[in-house]
Amino acid sequence: LSTHGGRARSTGQPVRVTAIVYTEHAKRFNAMLEKADPRFTAQLVQVDDFGPQTAIMMQQRIDAGEWLVIVGDRVPAREGGRTVTVPFLDGGAPFAQGPWVLAHALACPVYLFFSVKSRGRYHLHFESFAERIVLPRTARQTHIATWAGRFADRLANHCHAAPYQWFNFYDFWAGARSPGDNSSDGRS
């Protein structure tokens, strides 16, 4: 699980890394990347929604030894996409539920990946986040909010350490509700 910070690139690395991106968010950005370096876009898998087909494709890639990267600080592009609002940088912010539901379905370990530029070089930080994400049927939304909150805490820590290196190209706080108010509008 990564964020829109620093620079993420795996060219020349010994592990095959595939980035899973929302198609709607990525169209223009991917076209720009394709012009700059076609090798990078070859490592992108675009999805419209995180459903059963996406989970099957991801499981096949994991079974083949790939590492999958999903940014956890991007909400679904389509209206009504499932989000949870958690505390983040002194306010409430929406975070996608998809990464947590998929990690639960795939029963795979979850690592956090941050990239920070320091002294003219990018440094990659990997953290073990969870050996397994478990979302029991009872209180599922509460468990999702807990995992998203833990992720938001780690992201906030990195934002405080390198405040000009976290970026999103849309209004990140648009539609945010009070933390814990994850009801009513189809986004919970």
Which residues does each PLM region occupy?
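Catalytic core of membrane glycerolipid acyltransferases/transacylases, capturing the structured
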Residues: 1-49, 64, 78-84
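Non-catalytic C-terminal accessory region of glycerolipid acyltransferases
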Residues: 35, 39, 52-188
